[in-house]
Amino acid sequence: MLAAPALALQARAQDAKPIVQQAVTAELAANRDDQSHWRYLRSEAGGNSLIIVETEHGAISRHVQENGRPASAKALAEDDAHIQKFIHDPAMQQKQRQNGEHDDKSAVELMNLLPQAFLWSVVSETPEMTTLSFKPDPNFHPPDMEARVMGEMSGTLIVDRAQHRIRTMKGRLESDVTIGFGLLARIKQGSTFDVERRQVAPGYWEITETHVHISGHALFFKTIGQQEDEVKSDFTLVPLGTTLDQAVGLLKGAAK
């Protein structure tokens, strides 16, 4: 009688990994084909909020609120000056583009590692979504430090069943991660992340919430403290071919 539950759990674990792989495949295909750009509101902890407008030439932003109050004329003037500098400085545009490409490359690499980095199991299923849990796989050999930190996490993944897209991924670092015997860096146990994604238009999924709380030290006790809490909302598709000058109009129009 005891063998039946054990076999059921084993089958459940075996069923989980293909679900994760299918979600990863769907995400990578969507990312590869997605040429969309968006205007949206980014709200940060502390009461700051900004309108962001993306274009193929780069993204620009302008404050709406500071510390929970309407942005001051001084802050808006500083934003406008920075926008004009960005519009007329190809080097700034290139740097932003390179940073974005680097982040995208890292995200793709980590996404590819998801199925093999963890031990997966199905927690629950509804007609709309599947909830899975993950924990470190002792047989996983991370190729770099980012993967090493990721591989020490345990947490939850929620997948949309209709489109096989990732809705939620949240995790907690189960043990300290040290680099150079702890002299170069130590990321502390208990560090957490939570990323929420939703369909913002038919077939388009975007990150709508990010919560990252990481602590530790690096390079002989320099403190690591990444604390990020932001919500993105009010997504509107930006027309293809929109120039940066046209994006300024979209930016200011959204703030009215």
Predicted regions and their residues:
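Bacterial N-terminal signal peptides
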Residues: M1-A6
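Structured extracytoplasmic
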Residues: R12-S154, A162-R167, R172-G190, E196-Q199, ...
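Substrate-binding/catalytic groove segments of enzymes
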Residues: Y204-E206
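M16 family metallopeptidases and their MPP-like homologs
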Residues: E209-H211
